[in-house]
From Swiss-Prot:
It is a multi-pass membrane protein. One of its GO terms (cellular component) is plasma membrane. Keywords: Cell inner membrane, Cell membrane, Chaperone, Membrane, Protein transport, Transmembrane, Transmembrane helix, Transport. Required for the insertion and/or proper folding and/or complex formation of integral membrane proteins into the membrane. Involved in integration of membrane proteins that insert both dependently and independently of the Sec translocase complex, as well as at least some lipoproteins. Aids folding of multispanning membrane proteins. It is found in: Cell inner membrane. This is Membrane protein insertase YidC. Residues 28-54 are annotated as: Disordered. The lineage of its organism: Bacteria, Pseudomonadati, Pseudomonadota, Gammaproteobacteria, Enterobacterales. InterPro entries: Membr_insert_YidC, Membr_insert_YidC_N, YidC/ALB3/OXA1/COX18, YidC/Oxa/ALB_C, YidC_ALB_C, YidC_periplasmic_sf. Belongs to the OXA1/ALB3/YidC family. Type 1 subfamily. HAMAP family: YidC_type1. GO terms for biological process: protein insertion into membrane; protein transport. The chain crosses the membrane at residues 6-26, 350-370, 424-444, 458-478, 499-519. It comes from the Bacteria.
Amino acid sequence: MDSQRNLLVIALLFVSFMIWQAWEQDKNPQPQTQQTTQTTTTAAGSAADQGVPASGQGKLITVKTDVLDLTINTRGGDVEQALLPAYPKELGSSEPFQLLETTPQFIYQAQSGLTGRDGPDNPANGPRPLYNVEKDAFVLADGQNELQVPMTYTDAAGNTFTKTFVFKRGDYAVNVNYSVQNTGEKPLEISTFGQLKQSINLPPHRDTGSSNFALHTFRGAAYSTPDEKYEKYKFDTIADNENLNVSSKGGWVAMLQQYFATAWIPRNDGTNNFYTANLGNGIVAIGYKAQPVLVQPGQTGAMTSTLWVGPEIQDKMAAVAPHLDLTVDYGWLWFISQPLFKLLKWIHSFVGNWGFSIIIITFIVRGIMYPLTKAQYTSMAKMRMLQPKIQAMRERLGDDKQRQSQEMMALYKAEKVNPLGGCFPLIIQMPIFLALYYMLMGSIELRHAPFALWIHDLSAQDPYYILPILMGVTMFFIQKMSPTTVTDPMQQKIMTFMPVIFTVFFLWFPSGLVLYYIVSNLVTIIQQQLIYRGLEKRGLHSREKKNS
């Protein structure tokens, strides 16, 4: 195994990863855009089966804080629109990113309320409650750290239900507090619920390009319980009526997309039922229904839940609910991506530029791996030194494969050479590379993060393809500087075109990842020279053995 063969192994792993990405994308195809119509009727299999009715028409009120711009419907108190002023829709745009939306083309809402036997949101008790509010617009004023938006409803029996949204400065977590005043003579059985519903089909104005084979990220539902910290639930699965039905204390339900999430976190000591539902008309839902509580006559009951609506900021999400930070989609290598991101964030706190932070973390990672790299090159050099003996043995033994294998292993043992020594560092490097890929694709901090010159967004592909070309050039130089024993004509042709093939693949990769690979290649060139000099002194390398 030599450097040329290592590149073949990397290529095989890389292509395998691309095939896996494409396969994942094919399993979750983006359906054709269709117009979504809102309906107030309740279909079989809908969320109403969980005691959660469909929305009706009411008055729309607005709530503005320093980080949120919400529209709430007084019919039921659902959040029908959410704008995030701190995050532009596109790079350089003054238009804020829209997370929740209620239009004829697309539905994405955060619903909540009180169901159960006596809850005003129970379909058996009539239309959803039409809340009264003091005014149509609420604004978090300068110097104000908390904003409360109370909404009240009194039913035919005289019972009063108050739903209060509590906003805090700089916070994407919104507490929803309920007060139930029982003025009757019988106990009221009340259960809180929280539901997220969304159109499966993405209209053009919602498409972020995350379905690109190189930029593919998860869009769908998720939930968490003490037993299952983080489980994804695909929209297609819900649409096929393969629905979730789990009971657990604690936990949360969420809907995810690249960089942003909404989540309902029940705040109670009882058991919650987590469910999904196909609502029809191309709309799916995930939600929770809490264990009912009794509010005795003459008493006032209090219940609460929390809505997260905003960017996937890991430390803030972790403070809101256990494992909510896992919604940052780092894939199956999250256990590598998370510490890498913490290190990257720590570096950024000093240098203030995410691009330079990526460069520094590349040097750190490659520095830590230098002993493995040195062992890899040493093993490959010893293997090259054994090639004449191996060739002579093959000629001597002819077609006797069994004896060839036995004598070859004896030769490796006598010369203290591990034939897999050149592969081991690759096995470690590839997961790190993939973990960096997931980290760059999932970390909101890198969205629209500039580097220098023409790179204004490290999470997007290079608009002029300069970085991928530079990556291909560095790969070409590594090839030219590496000794080789590849004699097969087909392998030689593959090696010749390898930099070109990788350059084409990397045209669609995030600029931050390509930057990492360029710097990593430059470090490889430097480390190669240092290692080869040491090997020359030991008689294990000769510069005459380079490629011409």
